[in-house]
Amino acid sequence: MFQSLIAIDYGKARIGLASGQMITKTATPIGTVEAYDGVPNWIELDKIVKRWNPSDIVIGLPLDTQDFETDITKAAKDFAKEVKERYKRNVHLINEAYSTREARWRLEEVKSKKVSHIKVDALAACVILETWMAEN
């Protein structure tokens, strides 16, 4: 059974992160890890995985609006394989369509003074995790 979870909003420049619990079906933004052309700062990601010690990791799969794969979809799948091998955790992929749009909307709803990329990416990871938990 799933216990604690981490969700990842994969991106070429930044990777958004959220943590969650299946028992409460809630997700909380953790922050972001910088990436260079899709390669994350593995040292920082290692620290986060060690600290949160998730049973499973959920990774958003970037598809286009008609659920077709894009250039970044392959990069996200390769990243997911690396995460699975590196951390020896179950990795789940989920369509992340509109997660960034939903994150921006949520920040605007709470009148966040500064809608930064960091906030958006971490909140997008929350949306990904909430969606996955609702389906599982």
UniProtKB/Swiss-Prot annotation:
Keywords: Cytoplasm, Hydrolase, Nuclease, Ribosome biogenesis
One GO cellular component term noted in the UniProt record for this chain: cytosol
Main enzyme class: hydrolase
GO biological process terms held by the UniProt record: rRNA 5'-end processing
Classification via SMART domains: YqgFc
UniProt-recorded Gene Ontology molecular function terms: nuclease activity
Record flagged with keyword Cytoplasm: yes
Location(s) in or outside the cell: Cytoplasm
CDD domains reported in the protein's UniProt record: YqgF
Principal location: cytoplasm
SUPFAM superfamilies assigned: Ribonuclease H-like
EC number of the protein: 3.1.-.-
Family of the protein in this entry: Belongs to the YqgF nuclease family.
Function recorded in the entry: Could be a nuclease involved in processing of the 5'-end of pre-16S rRNA.
NCBIfam families to which the protein is assigned, alphabetical: RNAse_H_YqgF (TIGR00250)
Protein name: Putative pre-16S rRNA nuclease
Organism: Francisella philomiragia subsp. philomiragia (strain ATCC 25017 / CCUG 19701 / FSC 153 / O#319-036)
